[in-house]
Regions:
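Residue positions within transmembrane alpha-helices of multi-pass solute transporters
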Residues: 18, 84, 111-115
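Structural motif at transmembrane-helix junctions in multi-pass transporters
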Residues: 29-33, 88-104
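Membrane-interface interhelical linkers
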Residues: 1-18, 22-29, 45-74, 96, ...
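Hydrophobic core positions of alpha-helical segments in small-molecule transporters
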Residues: 39, 104-105, 135
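Hydrophobic/aromatic residues within the transmembrane alpha-helices of Major Facilitator Superfamily
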Residues: 14, 46, 80, 96, ...
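Alpha-helical transmembrane segments of compact multi-pass small-molecule transporters, enriched
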Residues: 43-47, 104-119
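Hydrophobic/aromatic residues within transmembrane alpha-helices
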Residues: 36, 92, 119-121
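Membrane-interface alpha-helices at helix entry/exit sites of multi-pass transporters
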Residues: 33-41
Length: 150
């Protein structure tokens, strides 16, 4: 099961990189980042709605009113955070290139993730940042420096 989860995460990473290029091209083609972001947001909403309705219809899964009421306030901010990322792909990626853009976003994500794991914030279990994890984060930063320089 763990292998399938890791494979799915790898596919998500691949698609995330491709999405950066498609978003930047959509923005360039339309010449209006807010409209391009709205198009991406609409597609995201419709895809998610279709998936949710399919799961509800075939698996009978839906949250209870109590579950919805007990969600921490910050857990609802994912859509806003995603919108900021989409805008960044449209405004920055084609100007700095795919490798720099993805390198920065992935490296920052790794460093922040190490911190979040270490302290167990936002619902993550605690995974202490030992020496090997810290060195791994530093190597990510060094790798980004090499990509940016060459």
């Amino acid at each position: 099961m763990q292998v399938l989860l890791i494979a799915f995460a790898a596919v998500a990473g691949l698609l995330n990189t491709i999405q950066t290029g498609t978003n930047a091209t959509l923005n360039k083609s339309l010449g209006a980042p807010v409209w391009a972001a709205a198009a991406v947001g609409t597609a995201t909403f419709l895809t998610t709605l279709f998936a949710a309705l399919t799961v509800m219809l075939f698996a009978g899964q839906r949250p209870s009113a109590e579950a919805v009421a007990n969600v921490p306030w910050w857990a609802w901010t994912g859509g806003v955070l995603g919108a900021v990322y989409v805008l960044a792909t449209m405004l920055v990626a084609d100007k700095v290139g795919a490798a720099i853009f993805m390198g920065v976003t992935i490296t920052v994500a790794i460093v922040v993730s190490l911190t979040m794991d270490h302290f167990g914030v936002l619902g993550f279990e605690v995974h202490k940042a030992g020496l090997a994890r810290i060195v791994g984060g530093l190597l990510m930063i060094a790798g980004l420096g090499l990509i940016a320089k060459f």
